[in-house]
């Protein structure tokens, strides 16, 4: 039941992030990002047997990256990475 509530909250949050337009500040519009600057490699670990099985399932079905400001089109928000980064995932094809 707790998993269902957590997954529902994540889905609703991801939906809200995708539907809300993000307002750029003057500072953000004046700075240029270097290609690949947003992409960061991340290692995620879960404790216990159940967490290990969940991690294996997620790693097979999803490709996840850490992004600076928002997830790209086709990606969903799946939590945070180290620091201010967002964990954005998409399904494997």
From Swiss-Prot:
Disordered: region residues: 22-41
Keyword terms: Antibiotic, Antimicrobial, Defensin, Disulfide bond, Secreted, Signal
SUPFAM superfamilies registered for this protein in UniProt: Defensin-like
Biased composition (Acidic residues): 25-40
Propeptide: 20-58
One GO cellular component, as annotated: extracellular space
S-S pairs: 64-89, 66-81, 71-88
Matching InterPro entries: Alpha-defensin (IPR016327), Alpha-defensin_N (IPR002366), Beta/alpha-defensin_C (IPR006080)
Pfam families from the UniProt entry: Defensin_propep
GO biological process, one term: defense response to bacterium
Localization in the cell: Secreted
Record flagged with keyword Signal: yes
Endpoints of the signal sequence: 1-19
Superkingdom of the source species: Eukaryota
Annotated function: May have microbicidal activities.
Family statement drawn from the similarity comment of this UniProt entry: Belongs to the alpha-defensin family.
PANTHER family registered for this protein in UniProt: ALPHA-DEFENSIN 1, ALPHA-DEFENSIN 1-RELATED
Protein name: Alpha-defensin 22
Provenance organism: Mus musculus (Mouse)
GN (gene name): Defa22
